[in-house]
Amino acid sequence: YSAHLFLRDRGKFKQIALGDYQAQFGQGLTFWSGRAFGKGADILMIKRSATGLRPYASVDETLFLRGGGLTYELGKFEITGFYSYKKIDGNVIIQDTSGLAQEEIEAINQEGLSISSLQQTGFHRTPNELEDKDAITQQQMGGHVAYKTRSLNIGATGIFSKIDAKFERSLQPYSQFRNQESEQAKVGLDYNWIYRNFNFFGEVSQSIDAGKAITSGAIVMLDPK
């Protein structure tokens, strides 16, 4: 099921979202819910166009937020805050407690739910897939502050995400650099500047575990027409 209430341009409130919605900021390094298509034959696709908050009206089970958010206009600034709470799928690890003492079993239970990965296929066909359905609670909260003029947009984004399960780290080589923390926090700065026939854009982001990312680009129109 999915439902939402979405309002635009209600006085100083530019966007008000309740229920299922999406949030997109900057170039997506810090936070972007929903799909974003990469570069193709059309070179203009190298730049993402963030919409801020938007209603969710698709069928994918993972690419949305469930809760509420709003965007408030204050002069040349737009301030956005949002919160999401929903159940998501995860590959649950069943601990084998046969032959263990009661104290050991209680210690395992106190550690809470363990998962090997998050499931994003949306399939619930087999007993294992049904067991993984809605196994984890995910909470996300964050905000974005943007300064906007006719030719320049500068924004700052912060996001905190938490799930109520811990990852069992895989020993496979491809998993060694995968973020497997139950709590994540990121901050980022983004910009978009139009000067004559030039459009410069980009974003820099950093996570709480010191991971960094940066993207920057430019679109140049050789003819003003």
Regions found by a protein language model. Give the residues of each.
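Outer-membrane beta-barrel channel domains
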Residues: 1-225
